Amino acid sequence: MQSKRLTTRQLTTIAILAAISAVLFMVEIPIVLFYKLDFSNLPVLLGAFAMGPGPATLILLIKSLLGLLHTSSQGVGELADFLMGFAMILPAGLIYQRHKTRKGALVGLIVGTIAATIAGVLSNLWLMIPFYGAVYGMPVEQIVAMGQTLIPAIQDEWGFVLMITGPFNLVKWVLISAVTMLVYKPLSPLLHHQG
């Protein structure tokens, strides 16, 4: 089996996209409770479409490691973001690499959005909520109560992640996917070093 090596141009593209992604990671828009929207995975998705999920994983990893330099979550937020980003770029990148059409991109983004939303729900349930509860001395019931102020039907942490985390991540990934669809083709010559 022959290994594929990255070219100098690909490494340069990875570095540039990772740097842009790391900067975007610091620009957060508060949405609801402690959830914030950022577009740092946009360059990662562009990398997945241009070069595939392998190089995109490097972009995502570099962004996450750089995010550790200014984290307030002691790395847990970056880990959750990495898991969601990977769940997005793997199917999106693989599908688009096999079907390099607008429809292939759309199908890849839809499958990736579903996978990333599920990863977001599970990483919040198993990582983020327990972590924030431990760090801030909040029992899970108190975090659930925060959610109940928005949606009274929430009864437990599963309800919290299904009614708040899931919809938030779905909207986040739909927005990132929409922007990706708008900018990939115009940026494609730059990403493929044709411009």
PLM feature spans:
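Loop-helix junctions at membrane interfaces
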Residues: 1-195
